[in-house]
Amino acid sequence: VAKRSPLAEKLDEVQGRIAAACAKAKREPGAVTLIAVTKTAAPEQIRELLQLGVGDLGESRAQQLSQRAMQLNEFYQRRKQHGDEAVPDKLRWHMIGHLQRNKVKAVLEVASLVHSVDSLRLAEELDIQAAKRNKRQPVLLQVNASEEPSKFGVAVGAAVHLAEQIDSMPALQLVGIMTMAEAEESEAKIRHTFVRTREVFEELKWHKIGGTSLRHLSMGMSHDFEIAIEEGATMVRIGTALFGGKPGDEVMEKE
């Protein structure tokens, strides 16, 4: 038997933990998508991930997202043409970090999903630029449910109103919400952040905002994804548990 690489072993471990958290929460393991956050990964590690079947990749900086997508998309297409069964059916890039309006054009070129829509002005710019490309861009509303001033995201109390505004934009498709918990907090505080986020999600559902498209809760990173899954996460953003680095490397704080 060929020896598994360190990355393959880490991926096995993370996928096992996701499956165990799903079982504990009485959820199907397929209900949670692993997004590999490639911020600290070397290009060859990302290529290896693709060949291990991981098709959802996340970056927190617009420029790096564009560069990585250019490098990897070509490799992915070549593997597909060679009939490589191991590579995933689709390669999806996720913009998970704070997005400035002047970077919107570049991000729309490559992002399948923008997780970090946290203001009306950003939503309007995304809507304008997506319309120019004749595309309907899936987005998540970022909510600051931990109420930490260092975190991006709309305040919980303003989330429904902003969601309604996004939902009315013809070139955007609101498919869910995203949040980040504080890395240093207690488990109880982290869980509270995720519960509040789920409550906002339920409130949007109740108001029929987003319609049937509203189905994603992007929450949980390397240090807290099991708690997030127990509280309903459908996407977890994992970097350090796969590639090393210090906890919170997946996060982007306010400058």
Predicted regions and their residues:
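Conserved alpha/beta-domain cores
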Residues: 1-225, 231, 243-245
